[in-house]
Amino acid sequence: SFFLNARFSSVSFATVSWVDVFTRPVYNEVFIDSVRYCQLNKGLCLHAWCLMSNHAHLVFSRSGQYSHSDILRDLKKFTSKKLIEAIENNPSESRKEWMLNIFRNAGQNKINNKDFQFWQQDNHPIELFSPSVTFQKIDYVHNNPVVAGIVSEADHYLHSSARDYLGNKGVLDVEILERPMSLEGHVISY
């Protein structure tokens, strides 16, 4: 079984002060491009994901030399830098000074930050130890936009892998996990 050969992890990470950064396509693209880079160069195997306005969820495994924590660290570091640059260089960003002040204030007095802190700290990958737990997490990730009242069906949300699990092509490449027969029809609602 696929589950015997891979270690699956889940992680959720949010912007500092839950700032709604991902309401503009330019910022969503920075995040998506960064995930793609990690898929191509860091061994990130993405199984489920969802990007909300101020946080992201990933269910993933890895291949190659980088650990789950290494991949997450690099993804967060790269997206932080690129998203701050995108905000600074966006002439039509009406919230620019407000957002940059929040990220600058959060970055002050932090040893591991030079200027800004974009993501909240202390979010570590959690190992998903069984198929049941893995699919509970995947269902949770996919239902995030439904629970938030953004869409009525999970697969209608663009920045999620829910559509991939229904046989449609999503924004990012996803390695779909097959739900074991024993879990068929067991969708967890939140």
Where are the language model's segments positioned?
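Short catalytic/metal-binding and nucleic-acid-binding patches
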Residues: S1-Y190
